[in-house]
Amino acid sequence: MSDLYDKTRQSWEDIWAEASVDIEFEVLDQKRTQETLGVYPAYLSKEGIILEAGCGLATVLMKLRAMGFTVIGLDYAERALHTARAYEPALDLQVGDVHALPYADNSLHGYLSFGVLEHFEHGIIPGLREANRVLVPGGTLVLTIPYPNVVHRLVRLKRRLRGQSVLTDDDFYESTYTQHQLIAALEQTGFDVALCVPTSHSYTLWGLGGPFRAKGYYRTSRLADALGAVLRVVAPWPFNFTTMLIGRKVRHVGR
């Protein structure tokens, strides 16, 4: 792996060191999170195992477990897993790489990835191929990836004018993808796309700061929530913060 991969990994260790499970639960209760959490569970099966690859503090897994799903989690940030286990010892969590999952072919019924695969220089295809490998035929993939929205483009322009990298910095890598790129990537890696929707428009506004931010951990203001609801209707893609895709495995690709 590259030096940037290792630096990004360390950045996540530092991020999780400053976070807490209780605060992450507050994020899950925010309206913008319900745009995803209120939708994708209906596509998951309670008959098999659901993996969250890149689970962080595992609050999503705790929510799904309470809903009756059988869940496991994996992350390369050990500190986050230690914190999650201390909060909920019964969780099945494992340290590992999303590109080399320690699970057999065709063994899992669901694969969740929330804001993970965009952090790798080599793109999202290797991670999607590995997701395909471990899913059973007909298994469900749930994926969220940042979108190159209006605010993101403004930030890129600002960085370019300052002579900085437009995508990342020296310690943390992140990329964005259009809905067309994501659909093509899923189809290339053996998935049929069941759903592709823009989400979290209020959080795009949060990126502008000022009146769009409320006190608290990444909280959007009432103004951001109200305008975000309007933008979701009148300009769904230009102000999309993160695209949610749900796919079904229709052919086995593997690594």
Where are these regions (language model features)?
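Active-site acidic short loop of glycosyltransferases
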Residues: 105-106, 137
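Flexible loop residues that form catalytic
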Residues: 58, 116, 199-201
